């Protein structure tokens, strides 16, 4: 693994679960608006540089907070896919499990991945590790992710920023 992250121009941008469910209600994440600002800026830079972009969308099924056929499960408008940008629908935290993400990355000659999205400690982390296990060099853009506080072993919450 390289000592430093690859430049965006030598990478493929993978946006993970940038869905409306994380912007409101029971699934709303701490710092989500600032993270989405960073995701949008990163996406603009990638598009301007001609970097391949792949969107990931979690499908939890009808009626769930991840219902991709409902507004709550849709990708946030300001970072929504443009024509030609594929969307990989997943059912597990690791976006490589039972999807065609690996095939799509191979098709664009990807070796370096720049990852952003939600939630940092779940799907972003799982996808980064899954990609590494398949030989990719993942870089997570911390400012373009968000999480929630989690219960700690001592009964005190672990802050979202620590994720």
Language model segments and positions:
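Flexible, glycine-rich phosphate/dinucleotide-binding loops
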Residues: 22, 62, 147
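Active-site-adjacent betaalpha module
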Residues: 1-12, 41-44, 48-49, 66-163
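Short beta-strand segments at enzyme active-site cores
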Residues: 15, 52-58, 141
